[in-house]
A protein has these predicted regions:
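Active-site capping/gating segments
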Residues: 200, 218-249
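Short hydrophobic/aromatic-enriched beta-strand-loop microsegments
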Residues: 150, 191-198, 217-224
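Segments forming oxygen-rich coordination pockets for charged ligands
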Residues: 1-151, 165-169, 182, 203, ...
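Beta-loop-alpha module in the N-terminal Rossmann-like domain of NAD(P)-dependent dehydrogenases
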Residues: 177-181
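Short amphipathic alpha-helix with an adjacent loop that forms part of the alpha/beta core around
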Residues: 156-166
Length: 272
């Protein structure tokens, strides 16, 4: 059973879900759950294993689901007597630990030029699973992207075949308007939490006008971040790349750009 539970955790994380794994670390008295009992719960509601059933398990499940939402590991201890935490009659105590496992964020970089490489170099320090796509093997190779998965081929084909999920961010930084347009058309309707395209305002406007002519992109094109990234006040490639990744994390975490100093001063003013 333990192997099945661990496999469940791995499989659900691979599918892009957060998962809680609860282990009872100690018990005494007549606790229905014994030390070593395990239970895993996926963000999607699926579960496997048991930590004793009844009121105890129900309480642990509620707290484990809350831990998934809060993204926080928790230790717990419950008194199982009549006057204890759960109003149970079996007596004893149980202690345990719930750990949250997270899916690794995937970053698809379309375009292996200087901007794509700069985005990659920063992204690998942030624990992204990086995939680089290009139609030029002299750019998209393991010398330039040693820790990425490399996919080289005709853009139409490789973009059609690349797999995405809700943990995927997509950065489109190809060498030309025509390739950017193909990338947006192939990827914008696929699942992702972020998709952005580089380009000047004129280039972006032209690309969007062309894409919007096709009704199948009507509901999805608005999720495209273009021009991509934050305004860093610089044309340096590494700073542009940093602005792109900052935008990705802001979108992922449901935030907007803000200086902590300004937020702090606003809070002070409200308390005056």
């Amino acid at each position: 059973m333990e192997r099945d539970i661990l496999k469940f955790v791995n499989d659900e994380v691979e599918r892009g879900y957060k998962v809680s794994l609860t282990i009872l670390t100690d018990s005494d008295g007549s606790s229905p759950g014994k030390a070593g009992a395990m239970m895993a719960i996926s963000e999607n509601g699926k579960s496997i294993g048991t930590v004793g059933g009844g009121s105890l398990e129900n309480k642990i499940m509620i707290e484990a689901k809350k831990a998934i939402i809060d993204e926080k590991d928790v230790e717990f201890e419950y008194n199982l007597g009549a006057n204890g935490d759960l109003g149970m009659l079996c007596g004893g105590n149980v202690r345990g630990y719930t750990k949250i496992f997270y899916p690794q964020n995937k970053l698809i970089i379309v375009g292996a030029g200087h901007v794509g490489k700069a985005v990659y170099e920063t992204a690998v320090t942030l624990d992204f699973d990086v995939i680089v796509l290009d139609d030029r093997s002299e750019y998209a190779n393991y010398d330039n992207f040693p820790n990425a998965k490399i996919i080289v081929g005709d853009y139409e084909k490789i973009l059609e075949e690349v797999e995405t999920d809700k943990t995927t961010a997509i950065v489109i930084v190809t060498r030309g308007h025509a390739y950017d347009k193909v990338a947006v058309e192939k990827l914008v309707n696929k699942e992702s939490f972020y998709i952005g395209m580089i380009g000047s305002k004129n280039k972006v406007f032209k690309t969007l006008q062309e894409i919007k002519k096709d009704a199948k992109y009507k509901d999805s094109i608005d999720k495209l971040y273009a021009p991509i990234g934050l305004d860093m006040g610089s044309n340096k490639v590494k700073e542009i790349a940093l602005g792109i990744l900052c935008e990705i994390f802001l979108v992922k975490n449901g935030k907007k750009p803000a200086f902590m100093r300004d937020l702090f001063q606003e809070k002070i003013k409200k308390n005056i």
